[in-house]
């Protein structure tokens, strides 16, 4: 065993020589002799000399201060990642060592606390969506959506899925990526009528070869789809109904399960997960008892031990890749347990009434912003919305956003990135955290820039 002579340096020259001697190599060069010499660097890396910790911290803070964040600027950017209130208890709880490094265990009986936390997450998701079963979490909402489509193909033995272009464009990209690995799968995208799915085109596309119909609720453009009407197109076609739903909106809107949804998926980022670098997030996946044995990911169940005490176990494990890899419903293994815990704590801290109140605030704040834009002379696209809506500008959105930053405002999402049909259109998110003054300032500056 090597003795490390430097407290903070785990690999000294003495250590290197001992290891080389053990494996029978005379030098590092001999060890990597199989690597072609023309691709070797043959010089030391260009790394600066070490600095005192205080000096280094000051320099890194100066670099970090160049970032534009929701702490330094007022954000109206959403499009899948939102600036919501997270109760202080969330960080306090998930930072506990029992949870912070916990991995979903293969021997569940030794991690009852972790399994109970996951069980509570599943229960909360079922309550929000009005579904029977939810899994322990997935990577993000888009992964959950793609897995839902794969389940539909497997369950129905059909090869066509009809999806609304009102779905998040990146969710559609993920689905197309999955579909490329299965050439027989056909993805049919349905155009929009304004900011909602064109129901006539959707109805015409659904036939006996359709495995599933998928929509978002509220959709990517902020509008609320008519789930009851859409479900009526599916009932006699033996296709599954997949709904990608914002869980916060479900605190107020009628849940998809009440409209006959077979699978409800989404992202719990609005509950306790900060907006940072696009992730990490936490996908949820909820379905019916009929489809329970085809659910991807892990399921935690409640049971009793020999003495009658309540306990928790990983259940229906035959679906998983560590049991039968070739027949697994999914190869997702390690999940987002820590983020699922964060969302569970946030939902529990807020309670049903708190979630409802925040959802109402989102609608009220967004509607106020809508009216202010209309008064300012902007064209606001029609559609009943939750906390996002679309505004048309006379100038390129990228240009508008670059100017807004000068006023410490992060503008909305440039929809021209998604479709030429939405060139010069901005998707604006207004959450419960946005104040009247912030909204008024945003509208005022946007109006000045649009003149």
UniProtKB/Swiss-Prot annotation:
The record's disulfide annotation reads none
What is its biological role? The glycine cleavage system catalyzes the degradation of glycine. The P protein binds the alpha-amino group of glycine through its pyridoxal phosphate cofactor; CO(2) is released and the remaining methylamine moiety is then transferred to the lipoamide cofactor of the H protein.
The reply to whether Oxidoreductase figures as a keyword in the UniProt entry is: yes
**Which UniProt keywords are listed?**
Oxidoreductase
Q: Which family does it belong to?
A: Belongs to the GcvP family. N-terminal subunit subfamily.
Q: Which HAMAP family match?
A: GcvPA
In terms of NCBIfam families, this protein maps to: PRK00451.1
Q: How does it assemble?
A: The glycine cleavage system is composed of four proteins: P, T, L and H. In this organism, the P 'protein' is a heterodimer of two subunits.
Alphabetical list of SUPFAM superfamilies matching this protein: PLP-dependent transferases (SSF53383)
| Protein name, UniProt field | Probable glycine dehydrogenase (decarboxylating) subunit 1
One Gene Ontology biological process: glycine decarboxylation via glycine cleavage system
What reaction does this catalyse?
Answer: N(6)-[(R)-lipoyl]-L-lysyl-[glycine-cleavage complex H protein] + glycine + H(+) = N(6)-[(R)-S(8)-aminomethyldihydrolipoyl]-L-lysyl-[glycine-cleavage complex H protein] + CO2
Task: From the UniProt record, list the coiled-coil ranges.
Answer: none
- Pfam families linked to this entry: GDC-P (PF02347)
Record-listed E.C. numbers: 1.4.4.2
Q: Which GO terms describe its molecular function?
A: glycine dehydrogenase (decarboxylating) activity
Q: Which domain of life is it from?
A: Bacteria
PANTHER family in alphabetical order = GLYCINE CLEAVAGE SYSTEM P-PROTEIN, GLYCINE DEHYDROGENASE (DECARBOXYLATING)
